[in-house]
Amino acid sequence: MKTAALFVSKEFEEEAIALVEGANYKVTSIYKLPKSPNVKFYIQYDKLQQIKNDEEISTLIIFEQLKPRHFINIRRELKGKEVLDKILLLLEIFALHAGSKEAKMQIELARLKYELPIIKETYTKSKIGEQQGPLGAGTYGVESTIKFYKRRINKLMKELESIKIFKEKSIESNKRNNIPSIGIVGYTNSGKTSLFNSLTGLTQKVDTKLFTTMSPKRYAIPINNRKIMLVDTVGFIRGIPPQIVDAFFVTLSEAKYSDALILVIDSTFSENLLIETLQSSFEILREIGVSGKPILVTLNKIDKINGDLYKKLDLVEKLSKELYSPIFDVIPISALKRTNLELLRDKIYQLATQLS
C-alpha cells in the first residue's frame, strides 16, 4: 500500500482521511493546512522539506485545490514522489470504482481538463528556461502533450454527448411505457445504496469507504402492481468542485431526468450539519438542472440517532420546504433495519400515481 502525507484543515480531517484510505493510501502523517498559503508551494517550505527527506512517504496529498504553479513547484522539489490535490484525489477514487465505460470516460475527461492548465503553464515556463517539462521532455515534449490532451478531450466530449442523447431517448421510451423513474440521491455514506438494496432486494456493494456507487444502477420494482424504476445515483460530496460536476453531467443527470427524487439524509448528524447538508444538497440539485419535480425526503439511520428524532424531523421538514418546492413528504427510516420501509413504499406508490 502506498504511503501518504496529508495536509488538511481540522474541520475536514475525518472526511479527508476516509477519502485517502478509500484511494488505497496509508496516511503516515497529518499536517494542518496553513492559514495563509505559501505563494510558491501552498504549504510551508519547511514541511515540504520534511516530506522530501522522508523516504517512507511516497505521496503528498493536499486537501485543497492547487493552482498550476503549486503543482509545478512542488513536483520540482519532490522528484520521485506523487503529488495530489483534492480534485486529483477524488478522480483517483472515482477511477477505482468506475463500473462502466461511460464512467471511465467521464473520469478521464475530468482529469485531462484539470491537468491541461498545469501542462500549459509548464510549457510557458519551459520556453523561458524555468522548467524542463512534465517528464524532462523540454518544450517540444510539452507541445506534443498539449496537442494530445486537446485531441483526446474533444473526442471524449463527442462520445459522451452521444451517450447523453442515447440515454435521453431511453428515458423518453420509459415514459411512453408509463414507467415512472425515481432517483435516489444524497451524500456519500448517507445510506443511499442500503436503501436501494432494501427496496429492490438487490445486493449492491455497500462500503464504509466513500463513492462506492460510480455508475447509476437502475432496477424496476413492483408496488401494488405498479412498475416503478428506481435509480441509485453517484453520491454528492461536500464542496464538490465545479470541474467534477461538469465532467460527471451524464451520470448526475440521472437525477435531472428522473420523474421524482428520494433525497436521503443522515439523521445522526448534528442540527448544524443537517442544515448544511440540506442546503448543499438542494444547491447541487439546482446546479445539475433539477427543478419542479417532487422530492421525497428520507431521514435515514434513525436506529443510530442520538438526540430528539422529532426535533430533527421538524427541522428537516421545515428547511426542505423553504429550500425547494415541491417537497412531497419527509419521513424517518432505517434502510438497514428496514424501519418504516413499508411506509416508504406506500409513499413511493402515491408519488408514482401522482406523476401519472
UniProtKB/Swiss-Prot annotation:
CDD domains linked? HflX (cd01878)
Species whose genome carries this gene: Saccharolobus solfataricus (strain ATCC 35092 / DSM 1617 / JCM 11322 / P2)
Classify the source by domain of life. Answer: Archaea
Q: Please name the Pfam families in this protein's record.
A: GTP-bdg_M, GTP-bdg_N, MMR_HSR1
Binding of GTP, residues: 186-193, 211-215, 232-235, 300-303, 334-336
**Which positions fall inside the Hflx-type G domain?**
180-356
Free-text activity regulation comment from the record: GTPase activity is stimulated by the presence of 50S ribosomal subunits. Hydrolysis is probably regulated by the HflX N-terminal domain.
Indicate the impact reported for F236P: Increase in KM for GTP and in GTPase activity
Q: Where in the cell is it found?
A: Cytoplasm
Subunit structure, interactors included = Monomer. Associates with the 50S ribosomal subunit. Does not associate with 70S ribosomes.
User: One MF term in GO for this entry?
Assistant: ribosome binding
Q: Which family does it belong to?
A: Belongs to the TRAFAC class OBG-HflX-like GTPase superfamily. HflX GTPase family.
- Give the CC-aspect GO terms: cytoplasm
Gene for this chain: hflX
InterPro entries referenced in this protein's UniProt entry, alphabetically: G_HFLX_dom, GTP-bd, GTP-bd_M, GTPase_HflX, GTPase_HflX_N, GTPase_HflX_N_sf, P-loop_NTPase, Small_GTP-bd
Its main subcellular localisation, reduced to a broad class, is cytoplasm
The entry's protein name is GTPase HflX
